[in-house]
Amino acid sequence: YIPLRQKKGPVPWHYALALFLSLIPLLLMKWSEVTTLSLFSFLGLSYLTFRVAQIIIETYDGLISSLSLPAFWAFLLFFPTFSAGPIDRSRRFEEDFRRRYTREEYLTLLGDGLEQLLIGLVYKFVLSALAFRLLSLCQPKGGLLLALAYGWCYGIYMFFDFAGYSRMAVGCAYILGVRTPGNFHLPFLSRDMKDFWNRWHITLSHWFRDYLFSRFLMRGIKGKWFKSRLSGACWAFLLNMLVMGAWHGLTLYYLLYGLYHGVLLAATEVYQKK
């Protein structure tokens, strides 16, 4: 798509076709999850799709004018983050890919990487295991208090399990000279739901914010789809989280999860703006 964009300019249907084609493997995989058909799936497909879609979107916007094949394939197949993120951006990645560190700079990066890797190991294999043991003691059918305790323990288990993996991925990336962004920042200290999604699975929520939420909202404002910017933001939150829920899985559970968070984010926006 990059050579076509350079030659023909920002042609909307070229962009739409390229973006749609990049999403086909992910759509087939999600469809196969809710049917008996095993159409298409492999490890890391979702995150590979995010990377390709980001390049196409930013190429159409004119933010990317060229991308060398070595940098392109290194970005797509970078093994520390290939299977489950964190989700990097191609322009930021390429800067690190081309950078030549001094000995002192790399030793600092190596130390930071080893620290992230060690913390990730403790999160994933010690604290996550302890949280899982607590989880096994709390049966959600044992009454309201036990159900609440189960919910809290499950949230803590999820955090240490995924944050541990993410820190290990970041640590490995640092060791290889790539400053991959982190995925979590004290999410349980969030002030509200908007703050929570700026702290939990950060690279995913920011990807959806930049490439779905903001674009839908700005298009709606320009097209006068909404009565006010506030109502537009509410609709954008609902769409954003529904799509995020569908990305997790095309099941009623995940769609309700997306709708629930969309409503909470919209309600937070209304409360803060009024």
Residue ranges and their predicted role:
Residues 1-274:
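Membrane-embedded transmembrane alpha-helical bundles that form the catalytic cores
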